[in-house]
Amino acid sequence: MREYYEHIKAKASLSMQDVIETCRSLTPSDYKTRPYRFPDLHNGVALLDNEDALNCYIAAYGEMHMIKCRSALQNFPFDNISGSIEIVDWGCGQGIGSMCVVDCFKEHDLLQWLKQITLIEPSKIALERAEINLTI
């Protein structure tokens, strides 16, 4: 996790796109062009338990998740936000969904309203990655 952490902490203002690019750069060379073929992924439904699997998952599916989240948030009433907000991300994986919401809050200058993010995930290593992604 150290190598990933070093790449991520070097970013001035972390975004989901930064995470995707970092994971692509850290994907094992045998899977750079086809990260979805990494055996531990099991077509993206496996409980991930190692760093290569985490990197390959984001390299393979991160862009798709980011687009889906942005699409879901495009009609969100950002102008109606006032008061504190908490995100509860159940089954957060590496924190992709929460990161996309945070990116949207940054774009709408609403980050000051976000008071807490609660991450819930059965994979310890994925949860650790989510914590890195959302605290840097």
What are the language-model segments listed below?
Residues 123:
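Conserved SAM/SAH-binding beta-strand->alpha-helix loop
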